[in-house]
From Swiss-Prot:
Natural source organism: Methanosphaera stadtmanae (strain ATCC 43021 / DSM 3091 / JCM 11832 / MCB-3)
Assembly and oligomerization: Forms a stable energy-coupling factor (ECF) transporter complex composed of 2 membrane-embedded substrate-binding proteins (S component), 2 ATP-binding proteins (A component) and 2 transmembrane proteins (T component).
Entries under Pfam families matching the protein: ABC_tran
Lineage of producing organism: Archaea, Methanobacteriati, Methanobacteriota, Methanomada group, Methanobacteria
Disulfide partners: none
This protein's UniProt keywords: ATP-binding, Cell membrane, Membrane, Nucleotide-binding, Translocase, Transport
Intracellular or extracellular location(s): Cell membrane
UniProt key word ATP-binding: yes
GO molecular function: ATP binding; ATP hydrolysis activity; ATPase-coupled transmembrane transporter activity
Protein name (database record): Energy-coupling factor transporter ATP-binding protein EcfA
Amino-acid positions noted as binding ATP in the UniProt annotation, renumbered to this chain: G38, H39, N40, G41, A42, G43, K44, S45
Gene Ontology CC terms, in alphabetical order: ATP-binding cassette (ABC) transporter complex
Function, as annotated: ATP-binding (A) component of a common energy-coupling factor (ECF) ABC-transporter complex. Unlike classic ABC transporters this ECF transporter provides the energy necessary to transport a number of different substrates.
Family: Belongs to the ABC transporter superfamily. Energy-coupling factor EcfA family.
C-alpha cells in the first residue's frame, strides 16, 4: 500500500510551554479508513490541525504523498487540496448565505471555471444527499445536515484524504449512524478517511484500524481486535470495551462461556458467535 500521509516525531508546544504532542509517528495508507481513539484533551484535534498545515509543529515533520509539508502560501494551498479537514463543529466551517455558495468556496479558490465550480459543488451535495438544500441558508439546517454540508465542502475540492474531527459529536444515534454510513460509503468509493472519536461502540463498525492517543502520544496502533483485547491500553487511554464486548466478557468471566480469542465487538460478530453455541 502507498503511504499518503505521515508524521515523523511530531512535537507541538502551546505558547505557554505545554506539550500537546510528544513525538507522534503516524502513517495513513491510501484507501484506509481509520480512527484516532482517545479521550477529550488527548491531542486528537491538535494532531489533525497539523495534517494540512493549519498548525505548524514545534519540531518534526508532516509528509503528504512522500513530500515534506512546507508552510509558504503556495505549499499550504496545495496541501489543503490534498488533505481536507472537517471540523467538529460545522458552524466553524459554514459561513456563506446559502449551502451551494458554502460548498463552492473551496473550488472557487482553486482557480477553476465557474462552470466547473458549480458542477463540483452540486456533485458533492448530491453525494451527501443535500442537493435539495442548495439554496437554503446553512443556519436553518439541523446538526446532521450541517455536518453533511461541511463534508460536501471538502468533497468539492476532490482531496485524497478526508480528516474528520469527532464527526458524530452532538448528533442523535440515528444521525450519528447516518454520518458514519456516509463516510463508510465514501471510503468504499476510494476516499482515504481518518476520524477522531471517543465513541468505542461506533469504531468497530467502520474502522480498518485504530490509533490510540493518550496525553499527546500514540500508545498503540492495530486492528479493532488487537486494541480491544489489550486491557492495559484500554485502561491507560481511559476507554472501555464496546457494549457488545462487555456482554461477552461477562458471559466469559461469570459463566465460563468462551468464544475464542477476544470478544465480538459488533452485533454481526455477536450473532455469528452465538450461532456456534446453539
Amino acid at each position: 500500500m502507498t503511504t499518503i500521509l505521515e508524521t515523523k516525531n511530531l512535537v507541538y508546544n502551546y505558547p505557554d510551554g505545554t506539550e500537546a504532542l510528544k513525538g507522534i509517528d503516524f502513517k495513513l495508507e491510501e484507501g484506509e479508513m481509520i480512527s484516532l481513539l482517545g479521550h477529550n484533551g488527548a491531542g486528537k484535534s491538535t494532531l489533525f490541525l497539523h495534517f494540512n498545515g493549519i498548525i505548524e509543529p514545534t519540531s518534526g515533520s508532516v509528509e503528504i504523498d512522500g513530500e515534506t509539508l512546507k508552510y509558504d502560501k503556495k505549499s499550504l494551498l496545495a496541501a489543503r487540496q490534498k488533505v481536507g479537514i472537517v471540523f467538529q463543529n460545522p458552524d466553524d466551517q459554514l459561513f456563506a448565505p446559502t449551502v451551494l455558495e458554502d460548498v463552492a468556496f473551496g473550488p472557487m479558490n482553486m482557480g477553476l471555471s465557474e462552470e466547473e465550480v458549480k458542477t463540483r459543488s452540486m456533485d458533492a451535495l448530491e453525494k451527501v444527499g443535500m442537493s435539495d438544500y442548495a439554496e437554503k441558508p446553512p443556519h436553518h439546517l439541523s446538526g446532521g445536515q450541517k455536518k453533511r454540508v461541511a463534508i460536501a465542502g471538502i468533497l468539492s475540492m476532490k482531496p485524497k484524504v478526508m480528516v474528520l474531527d469527532e464527526p458524530t459529536s452532538g448528533l442523535d444515534p440515528n444521525g450519528a449512524s447516518s454520518i458514519m454510513q456516509l463516510l463508510y460509503d465514501l471510503n468504499k468509493e476510494g476516499m482515504t478517511i481518518i476520524i477522531s472519536t471517543h465513541d468505542v461502540d461506533l469504531v468497530p463498525l467502520y474502522s480498518d484500524d485504530i490509533e490510540v492517543i493518550v496525553d499527546g502520544k500514540i500508545i498503540k496502533s492495530g486492528t479493532c481486535k488487537e486494541i480491544f483485547t489489550d486491557k492495559e491500553v484500554i485502561d491507560e487511554a481511559d476507554l472501555r470495551l464496546p457494549w457488545i464486548g462487555q456482554l461477552f466478557e461477562k458471559l466469559d468471566k461469570e459463566h465460563n462461556i468462551t468464544f475464542g480469542n477476544g470478544y465480538p465487538l459488533t452485533v454481526s460478530d455477536a450473532y455469528d458467535a452465538l450461532l456456534t453455541k446453539l
